[in-house]
């Protein structure tokens, strides 16, 4: 559940789960499961996997969430990149999800990325679900030039639909 849809009680869960660790106020609720899972793995010889909306491995979530998991010496064992998940509910509540497994660092078994029905062995799976080193790109805090105003919301469709063009407007 995205941060804007969370109840007061759900927002309070973040301070309980994160404890003294700093966290972003815009994290999806599923972030708590990843933190709890990493905490558990760091104290045991366990592994887990979650299905989560793909927003968990995009944008600010990566810089706000995954450094906490890395400090617990937890790594990704396998990952399924984004795919559409539908159900039989009225109105078919389809969402785009990923599957992500976490395990203690140093396990000798292979790591795999599954994408489009293809399994690829990986040296390392980073939080962008790529076979690449663990890097975290932070959100820039200032415009790239003083000629541009600061961006308040980034990529957030909050214009009331006014930026949609019909075919005639597009051709014009």
Label each region the model flagged.
Residues 1-172:
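Signature of N6-adenine DNA methyltransferases within the class I
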